[in-house]
Amino acid sequence: MLSISSVSNFRDVAIGPKMKKNLLFRCAKMSFLNTEDIMKIEKLNPYAIIDFRDPKEINKAPDNLSKKLLKKYISLPISASTLNRMVVQKKIEGDYKLTYEKVMEDSYKLYLNNHKHIWKEFINILLNSNSTPVIFHCSAGKDRTGIASYIIQKLL
């Protein structure tokens, strides 16, 4: 099992007997990746390192990748402001019955529906990886990365 301590939320996506372990990994931004962990990831030799953050997030905290790993880097931006815009719109519409669960459910639907081209490209990358590891992340490794994990787990 690959252990990366300098990146939050780094873990294998595999669940259950249908999924192979040590092929798909999710995590938070890789901005604080230390030398030891860079070497571990280089040894893993991933097919791709997919970043779901938008350009503003990337500029604020770029991934700390080696030259070798930068060659594997793919940006598939999904705006994190989707959730904030939705909350503001609900308040404008007078929907004061905002519950955390409802807001999250609606924002996840927007992440899926407004970025179908991104999800299609993500799946194509996975299909082309030929059982070579893939790492994917966003800022916290929760929402966009969680949706990506959910898609994979449902497809398998």
Briefly describe each language-model feature range.
Residues A140, R144-T145:
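Ser/Thr-glycine-rich phosphate-binding loops at phosphate-binding pockets of nucleotides
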Residues M1-I135, I147-L156:
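Cys-dependent protein tyrosine phosphatase-like superfamily
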